[in-house]
Amino acid sequence: MKQIEITVRLNEDKQTAMKKLSELGYKVIRQSDVDDIYMTTKLDELNADNIQYVLKKSILLRKLTVNNTEIKKITYKNKEIDSNGNVISEQKVNLNCEDIDKAKKLFSYVDFKELVRVKYHVTVYEKDGIELAFQDVENLGTLIEYENNDRVVKEENKIEEEKVSKIL
């Protein structure tokens, strides 16, 4: 499934932003804690000019905790990047994983090295099918992410096609 993703840094107090969403009718639908380990075979090639390339060649070991339930996954994200280096869409491949440490060890045997570890808390707000995720990232700050899945993209394309057919 292809997703359109927009992620921006929150430039105001988080509590103020969350209050604004609540006033607009958004409701908290879930919270989770995420511990991501990015691994790559391209670590030795990493420089300021090729970060997106190295990330595209990375796998992600993820431990997600939701409602005291742990979910462990191995993920590959195939990101589509524009000429400015912005991620404009991505397709994910997820596999369930019983043991993140063993998975990390397995990937190390085939020359994958840890690129970065990212830990964050997520609070997801929803209204009318629109979800906004506040991500409190350790040592980085708060980001807001919007993801539009393939179903919504198809619906938007259908609406555009209907508009065009009315004109023709």
PLM feature segments, named:
Residues K104, L143, E161-S165:
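Hydrophobic, well-ordered secondary-structure segments
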Residues V152-L168:
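Mixed-charge, glycine-accented linear interaction segment located at domain edges/termini
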Residues M1-G129:
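N-terminal strand-loop-strand beta-hairpin
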Residues V110-K154:
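Conserved, surface-exposed functional patches that form binding/active-site neighborhoods
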